[in-house]
Amino acid sequence: MAKKRVTLPKEFNELLTDGNIDQLKAVYNKCELTAHNGRYSLSTALHFGGVPDELVIWLIEQGLDINIPDYYGATPLYRQAILGRDTVKLLLELGADIEKPNNYGDTPLHMAAEFFHPKTVKFLIDKGANVNVENDMGRTPLASVLMVCRGIYIAQTAEIASMLLDAGAKKTSKMKERVEQIGKDFEFHRESIHPDYIEVADKGLAKLYELFDVKPVEKRLTHDGVSPIKLVEGSWEEQYEQLWSFLIPSSGPAKTVQGEVIRIPGRVRDELDRNGGANWDRDYRKMLQAMPHYLSLGSSLSDQELEEIKQVIAQIHSKENDDEASLDRLCQLALAWIKQNPNPIDLKEPSYNR
């Protein structure tokens, strides 16, 4: 008797789409029940989105372990929870382990929450899932959904958070801080969010503020493009933060040169600090190289200061350079120029795309 294959046929996804049960069962005439889609995935048919209920039942009846892990230790229940599919209900009815985590400690409830599936979250809670289980990063399902929450998912996050709290999930001070940050991020990007989502997101945000006793973040005031730009009293850091909120758009370059000389060091700092320079390319270098030109417009900085800027930007993202200090200095020089040039200067289309 010929040895059966350990991998699924290449056309398996197409067979799932067609949904012909006899053809799907016939796959296992030549394949092991544990056949998967590759050694760096190890996803069996039970892990696939769109797997028919009849095939799920048949495979388990034939002896396939309902909790079989893939390459990352994820069970079929875990994968179906990511997708928010009703297959979750079937797998639990057939005996799936509701708490079995992947290799990183995430449970199916973590995934249903992180991928914003309120119905799946409710179902898992009703079936007894532990709402305070922690993954390897020490995050509960509630902490996890707050961590990944962005813009258009605020309403789902609020609904999920409410369910988890009602089921006994514990609140922490870090969660409160995270809700405040969600509010700040939303207000900063409000202008770029599609109008169809605004009302629902606002209601969700109000719910999050209520659930975590957070003072609502004020709506952002932005520059009108024509009025003089005034700096607040305070440290250069406070002045920089004020202008960042006032002049920087949700995405893309600023409308004014004043805004752009604030945006560039901030954008570069984010890439180097948060992203480790993984996406560093010519456009980042072009952004920096544009600074001397921008700061020479209108009432220019001194020749000595412009020369200093050139030296500073030449050293950024080079070996053994203190990028933090270099970017701080760029911010300070940008603020000095803005003080000399309060009247907005329209920004011409830049040569970079960052």
Sequence positions of predicted segments:
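N-terminal segments that cap or nucleate solenoid repeat domains
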Residues: 2-48, 54-59
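Ankyrin-repeat boundary/"N-cap" motif
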Residues: 5-12, 35-48, 69-80, 101-107, ...
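Ankyrin repeat domain, specifically the short helix-to-loop turn at the C-terminus of the second helix
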Residues: 26-33, 57-65, 89-97, 122-130, ...
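Hydrophobic, helix-prone linear segments
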Residues: 26-27, 39-80, 87-93
